Amino acid sequence: GGTPPHANWPGGARVAVQFVLNYEEGGENAILHGDPASEMFLSEIIGAAPFEGARHMSMESIYEYGSRAGAWRLLDLFRDRDVPLTLFAVAMAMERHPAVIERALADGHEIASHGWRWINYHGMHEDEERAHLQRAIEIHSRICGERPLGWYTGRTSENTRRIVAEEGGFLYDADDYSDDLPFWSTQTDTPHLIVPYTLDTNDMRFATAQGFHTGDQFAAYLIDAFDTPVSYTHLTLPTIFRV
């Protein structure tokens, strides 16, 4: 609203920067995962249609890149610069490729849960979604040695936030895009912390309409998005910048 709270960031900082690595490859729709069709969402094959009842070999290969090469390149980059990351890690992907998680833990990164599967939960029965959440927690706890404290589904149902809050062990969820600061949800029976995420300063826009075509475009957009709350004299309140 017109009088947002003043976030007291350490050292009087104006902007809290959060870098997020979505580790999803291995949890997407695929015939080999028992799904009725191949993945169609967020790939270099723009507008890809799902293959019903058949494997999409190119799509499977595209999604395999993350665990084979992409994640390691990013982890090396953040290690070299000593910058912390939050991994939104899909539990099925964690289980298939635990070495990525082991490396992230060794580097001191936060591992938040991104659900059991990287699928659309809209319309899923509440009992099934709750079972997926419990399975994600079990896998995460086994691989990481402790349960997840952060949660992000991505493609939620109308029940997701309540299910997450009722589980009782999470410090926050990030299934929200509505604010520049964390806030307490009033949609649950008990106070539940929301740390908003972003689909704006997000490299998924390389695979969406009106997105980015070059690294220079993405870099310029990130710089503008960061500089705006810092340089405008009337924007004096601390904020979060998420990438």
Name each model-derived stretch.
Residues 42, 66-71:
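Early transmembrane hairpin module of multi-pass membrane proteins
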